């Protein structure tokens, strides 16, 4: 446990000492809220509004709809990119020093994943400084549900990041592959647009995307979907169905947990063998 804590602590200290990284964690989400939220709010309402749902569209606030997606984006990108430190440590020789020590390789992998998980949750929580400016009401009940959900999602995504980092040898290669993965996963998760009326092949990609369930879980918690008008809930894409079954927050948490167990196992095995 001591070695896991030491690796976790190292990543946390590096995060807080990197001022540029802290600034960047605010800048990109802020730009997304301004450009997508404010600039496209009217267009999205017009596209989603139909003759049968005028009242629902009148109360559709795209900025509020998008905010949980921004949280998902921040947690996703931070979790995945946290594994970049593994590749950099390998390139600079630091990882070799750890590997020749009596520390178990599984402990190294778990320590790195927990470090990435914690940083991702911290950055996700920092986004709540924008809440007063977008008119969202966040209460204690929401946060009690949201924080464990964020830890669960960040753990799963950090495990995916470590799996990728264990398979790639250079920082440039890692960043290239991650960039290729990030945008399809984000845009097919419903983070920025309701995922309704998609073609069958795209629905399949949405269904197998772990980020879909993560973002939907965040939206249902933050927007308190169970209290929304049914028409508005439908318009916002919060009635996610898989194989004809409407998914609940519990279903989504269970799916993300199973993915997390699978990916941390694969990542630990791959990390142990590749180094």
Regions found by a protein language model. Give the residues of each.
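A short amphipathic helical element positioned immediately N-terminal to and/or at the very start
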Residues: 1-16
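Residue-level recognition of transmembrane alpha-helices
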Residues: 7, 25-26, 66, 70, ...
């Amino acid at each position: 446990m001591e070695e896991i804590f030491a690796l976790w602590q190292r990543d946390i200290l590096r995060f807080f000492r990197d001022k540029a990284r802290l600034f960047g964690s605010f800048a990109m989400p802020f730009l997304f809220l301004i450009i997508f939220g404010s600039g496209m709010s009217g267009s999205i309402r017009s596209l989603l509004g139909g003759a049968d749902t005028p009242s629902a569209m009148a109360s559709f606030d795209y900025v509020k709809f998008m905010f949980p997606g921004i949280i998902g984006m921040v947690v996703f990108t931070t979790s995945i990119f946290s594994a970049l430190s593994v590749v950099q440590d390998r390139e600079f020789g630091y990882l070799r020093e750890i590997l020749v020590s009596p520390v178990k390789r599984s402990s190294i992998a778990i320590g790195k994943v927990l470090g990435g998980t914690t940083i991702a949750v911290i950055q996700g929580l920092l986004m709540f400084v924008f809440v007063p400016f977008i008119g969202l009401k966040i209460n204690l009940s929401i946060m009690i549900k949201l924080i464990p959900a964020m830890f669960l999602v960040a753990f799963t995504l950090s495990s995916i990041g470590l799996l990728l980092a264990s398979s790639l040898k250079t920082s440039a290669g890692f960043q290239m592959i991650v960039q290729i993965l990030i945008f399809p996963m984000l845009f097919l998760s419903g983070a920025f647009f309701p995922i309704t009326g998609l073609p069958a092949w795209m629905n399949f990609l949405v269904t197998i995307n772990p980020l879909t369930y993560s973002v939907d879980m965040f939206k249902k918690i933050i927007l308190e979907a169970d209290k929304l008008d049914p028409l508005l809930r439908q318009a916002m894409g919060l009635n996610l169905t898989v194989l004809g079954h409407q998914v609940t927050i519990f279903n989504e948490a269970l799916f993300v947990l199973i993915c997390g167990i699978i990916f941390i196992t694969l990542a630990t095995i791959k990390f142990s063998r590749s180094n």
